[in-house]
């Protein structure tokens, strides 16, 4: 006879993620590219439990908004906050123009007060590394126009602080190159950014597994954005669910407070009172 065991009824206190003037209970964000089809994308988004979904404005433009094949028209936006992004922009000026276009698209589908933009300025077509100066220039202008700016950057603590001081609602350092699945290759710098930040730090790019997402959350990241790891998995909805669990576990562990690493072994069983006979 096979025994079954119920999971613990314990419910950890998970604090909300605050970005600008909005609160979110999920700390996992998802991108919308690379899925096999619309149905798989929708199932993955649901399985992830995410509340923030980022869509490339250029891809939304190139698809017919009224088309049933377009992801924008295929989701229940009452449960999801849309974050347009400026992917594909190579200059600050181009990113600014696309950010304004993204804001108009969100209004057209009912997000009247949505000023979110994921700012990407990427002139490097091979490694897809962001332009720090271009990002800062674009961010300063967009903040002045009442955008809630979430900038994608290298794991540069100085730039992260400059963007925070410019009024960005978060900073989004890359863990490793976009789509690489290499995890947190810039761990030390990301830790410095988190330590110095007064805004949420969202680890964006390079997350390949739930354990890597958990690692980011364990060091105090405010959230994680994943795309390729989910969309290219053999079972995308299953991976989306696993990513949700990884983020939840990492955040709960961070709040719990981990033990300090030691050089010597420490017995887990008490030695006081043992018989010496």
Swiss-Prot record:
It catalyses: [ThiS sulfur-carrier protein]-C-terminal-Gly-aminoethanethioate + 2-iminoacetate + 1-deoxy-D-xylulose 5-phosphate = [ThiS sulfur-carrier protein]-C-terminal Gly-Gly + 2-[(2R,5Z)-2-carboxy-4-methylthiazol-5(2H)-ylidene]ethyl phosphate + 2 H2O + H(+). Keywords: Chloroplast, Plastid, Schiff base, Thiamine biosynthesis, Transferase. Its main location: plastid. It is found in: Plastid, Chloroplast. Pathway: Cofactor biosynthesis; thiamine diphosphate biosynthesis. GO terms for cellular component: chloroplast. SUPFAM superfamilies: ThiG-like. The active site is at residue 118. InterPro entries: Aldolase_TIM, Thiazole_synthase_ThiG, ThiG. 1-deoxy-D-xylulose 5-phosphate binds at residues 179, 205-206, 227-228. Pfam families: ThiG (PF05690). One of its GO terms (biological process) is thiamine diphosphate biosynthetic process. Its EC number is 2.8.1.10. It is an enzyme of class 2 (transferase). GO terms for molecular function: thiazole synthase activity. Catalyzes the rearrangement of 1-deoxy-D-xylulose 5-phosphate (DXP) to produce the thiazole phosphate moiety of thiamine. Sulfur is provided by the thiocarboxylate moiety of the carrier protein ThiS. In vitro, sulfur can be provided by H(2)S. HAMAP family: ThiG. Belongs to the ThiG family. Homotetramer. Forms heterodimers with either ThiH or ThiS. This is Thiazole synthase. It comes from Emiliania huxleyi (Coccolithophore). The lineage of its organism: Eukaryota, Haptista, Haptophyta, Prymnesiophyceae, Isochrysidales. The gene is thiG.
